[in-house]
Amino acid sequence: MNSLFASTARGLEELLKTELEGLGATDCQVVQGGVHFQGDTRLLYQSLMWSRLASRIMLPLGECRVYSDLDLYLGVQAIPWTEMFNPGATFAVHFSGLNDEIRNSQYGALKVKDAIVDSFTRKNLPRPNVDRESPDLRINVWLNKETAHISLDLSGEGLHLRGYRDGTGMAPIKENLAAAIVMRSGWVPGTPLLDPMCGSGTLLIEAAMLATDRAPGLHRGHWGFGGWAQHDDAIWKEVKAEAQTRARQGLAAYGSRFYGSDVDERVIERARRNARRAGIGELIDFAVKDVAQLNNPLPKGPYGTVISNPPYGERLESEPALIALHSLLGRIMKSQFGGWNLSVFSASPELLSCLQLRADKQFKAKNGPLDCIQKNYHLAESEGGKPAMLAEDFANRLRKNLKKFEKWARQEGIECYRLYDADLPEYNVAIDRYGDWVVVQEYAPPKTVDAHKARQRLFDIIAATIAVLEIAPNKLVLKTRERQKGKNQYQKMAEKGDFIEVQEYNARLWVNLTDYLDTGLFLDHRIARRMLGQMSKGKDFLNLFSYTGSASVHAGLGGARSTTTVDMSRTYLEWAERNLRLNGLTGRAHRLMQADVLGWLRESTEQFDLIFIDPPTFSNSKRMEDAFDVQRDHIRLMTDLKRLLRKGGTIMFSNNKRGFRMDHDGLAALGLKAQEISQKTLSQDFARNRQIHNCWLITAA
């Protein structure tokens, strides 16, 4: 009998144990990452040929304590390597694990290689050569703390490499994991199996091989026992011949079909090639089809199983499309596949909830570094029609707001407005419309809120938003932000450079919904910008802390004699220039200046009739000369502004400081007075958030 070890993906150990026992293995003991078992030579070869779940089959050779590199060398050399190698056999060493003495896996592999080679030279035998690419023998050494476990890897390459796949689509799963997903899906061989996002066909091919009794190792051309002196070629040939016979008989006897579809024509063609190489191509119907086009291939029966490993994104920007995809899949399952079973494997439990189905069973497994879950559902025969909306109370509020604001915005001549602003506390997001695009901004939840529940609620919000607004998922942009404390934090998010043109009254403006936390247009200042346009005719206009210059555009369109736009950011000044140019506002009358605004104010000697200033609540930028606090420093600011203000001129002063208190006495000492116009500058879409900004008109007393 041989003591053997089969490794597998985390989470599949018990399933592998059952499989090995079915092959005849005895004394099976589950450990993390695999199963120890006993078996004779025939069982050894059968496990290599027939295990659909094992990653590798290893023959343990010994172990040694490692307190130094010499201990490792001597421990390896104690194994009778000369009795193990066929003459001329090549080998490679795979070393994993570190300890205080062996701190580099390459160094560990080198010491093992030296010990093996020296075993031959000491006996005056030809030394074996190393072949890292395709060795005849593969030695596996795992160093766990102070113990090195030394094994002969009889698999050679990983057993997931069946020999039928020449390439994959994006984010593939290994074949042994695919086999486990099939085994856990509840699918019964002989009944239909459908994969609506099949990619390169791995799930369906593994299922078809299982159903037709085709051994997973039948198409492999290289093994790890070719140079093993104890290899019994006669028994191996018997095992292989039996597998070939069973595959022929299984294929001839199988009567059901498999169905696979994917939106990518090239991936489907690859799936067809893979299936043909696996010997089961005639059983699988592959089609180029989007999930939205999915239909039941057997509407009159029999019932079958839908199995899928849909995409699950790790980037925030991909989530709206994935949420919509899962919601769509759930709706199609309910409407067209009543009586069937569904099994979905995913790294995102939150996305699975978008199916709006109740799971009967669930399993956990690792897909590489990802913690994944597989959920099985039974689709009731009576399921059908329109499913209930996720987050129904949120959806109802959004629907109500849409009805109210859509007509109003059309009448106002604006394309950008707020549709929802945390109206319901449990749905803590802001939703803004920019033409036919929508931006959902999630306010970062408090640390006391369960992260999983918060993410789940966000997914519900996105699914409901897409449904209520009837928008394409790629027209929804998702952002997460702290509650805004001012406009000093223009955080860079991406480098897409995608700008869209929007209309605000008579102004055309560029917005960018993806590259920054903000979009280039502060919607709450819409009415203030219109007022500036109405006040600007024939005047010299100054825009300080100008951001993307939208106020300058309104002033220019309102007939300003000149506009001067000042900001410290080159990025935003270039954006402002694009906005001005889009509206035909070019030439010497429309200046843009990159400068520290506070420093520029102190040094400038120019005069202006109308000044708009919207400073940050607080800033200590390295490029500014000193820290700025709008509450503390606004009178100092007004001192500089007054010097630039012509007789009869007006300053429009706005900021986002909640609870801001104007120092009227300080203003009076400067010969100025302030009229608060905050409520006049708030439009309907910001009526619920009356403290989003405060705004003042400041003139000579």
Swiss-Prot record:
Positions of the THUMP domain: 43-154
Gene Ontology molecular function: 23S rRNA (guanine(2445)-N(2))-methyltransferase activity; RNA binding; rRNA (guanine-N7-)-methyltransferase activity
Main location: cytoplasm
InterPro entries according to UniProt: 23SrRNA_methyltr_KL, DNA_methylase_N6_adenine_CS, RlmKL-like_Mtase, RlmKL-like_Mtase_CS, RlmL_1st, SAM-dep_methyl-trfase, SAM-dependent_MTases_sf, THUMP_dom
Keywords: Cytoplasm, Methyltransferase, RNA-binding, rRNA processing, S-adenosyl-L-methionine, Transferase
Domain of life: Bacteria
EC nos: 2.1.1.173, 2.1.1.264
Transmembrane segments annotated in the record for this chain: none
EC class of the enzyme, as a word: transferase
Localization per Swiss-Prot or TrEMBL: Cytoplasm
Protein name according to UniProt: Ribosomal RNA large subunit methyltransferase K/L
Source organism of the structure: Klebsiella pneumoniae (strain 342)
Upper taxonomic lineage: Bacteria, Pseudomonadati, Pseudomonadota, Gammaproteobacteria, Enterobacterales
The protein's role, per its UniProt record: Specifically methylates the guanine in position 2445 (m2G2445) and the guanine in position 2069 (m7G2069) of 23S rRNA.
Family assignment from sequence similarity: Belongs to the methyltransferase superfamily. RlmKL family.
GO cellular component: cytoplasm
Catalytic activity annotation: guanosine(2445) in 23S rRNA + S-adenosyl-L-methionine = N(2)-methylguanosine(2445) in 23S rRNA + S-adenosyl-L-homocysteine + H(+); guanosine(2069) in 23S rRNA + S-adenosyl-L-methionine = N(2)-methylguanosine(2069) in 23S rRNA + S-adenosyl-L-homocysteine + H(+)
